[in-house]
Design a protein with these regions (language model features):
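Core catalytic alpha/beta fold that binds nucleotide/phospho-ligands
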Residues: 1-207
Length: 207
């Protein structure tokens, strides 16, 4: 599958970005993944997205001298080689991966349109969180996209034992401004960094 790699520095981490052309994907492209046989029942689009994410992950692992690839869990989640933690995200024809020696979460989303923001608002934020977004000085569709993305990154950055007992709506927005934001999960606070890359929003959480 044809793809292009870009390296994005964010919050002291190196994010590997893969822009890929799904039209060039062929099923045999998956053969370099040890578990490729388990992907045969997936649709072509999902296979291409998965491959792009694992290519990004391979580059991320290579940066720390790790030659092993992530395995795949029973929920299709990446299982990172010990002692590493990592995160993968994809949106459209772009995939990201980041690796660290502690839990880390990355997410990429296409910026919501005003119409989509109005449709999704009630499923992403509470009335109190909406007040915080409106006071942030950021355009509401951007702020809502950031909040959604941040909660995704926050969940990914939780230790697997914690993930089993929490959901998206357990995270609460504590503060948001240009370049960074804060979430709360019970009594724990998560600090995140974010950037805007064209039509995309990228958030990174490293508790």
């Amino acid at each position: 599958m044809r793809h292009h790699r870009t390296v994005l520095p964010l919050a002291g981490y190196t994010i590997q970005q893969i822009d890929f052309d799904p039209a060039t994907f062929q099923p045999e492209d998956l053969f370099w993944l040890p578990y490729h046989a388990s992907l045969t029942g997936w649709g072509r689009k999902r296979q291409a997205e998965h491959l792009a994410g694992r290519i990004a992950a391979a580059y991320a692992l290579r940066e720390v001298g790790e030659k092993r690839l992530p395995a795949i869990g029973d929920q299709r989640q990446p299982l990172w080689p010990t002692p590493w933690f990592g995160s993968i995200s994809h949106c459209g024809q772009r995939a990201l991966a980041v690796i660290a020696d502690r839990p880390v979460g990355v997410d990429i989303e296409r910026r919501f349109t005003p119409q989509l923001a109005a449709e999704l608002e009630s499923s992403i934020i509470s009335p109190a969180e909406k007040t915080a977004l409106l006071r942030s000085g950021l355009p509401f569709p951007l702020a809502l996209t950031l909040t959604f993305s941040a909660k995704e990154s926050g969940f990914k950055a939780c230790h697997p034992d914690v993930q089993a007992g929490v959901g998206f709506n357990d995270f609460t927005l504590a503060a948001i401004k240009e370049g960074n934001l804060r979430l709360r999960l019970s009594t724990v606070e998560y600090r995140l960094q974010w950037i805007q890359a064209g039509e995309y929003i990228i958030t990174l959480c490293a508790p």
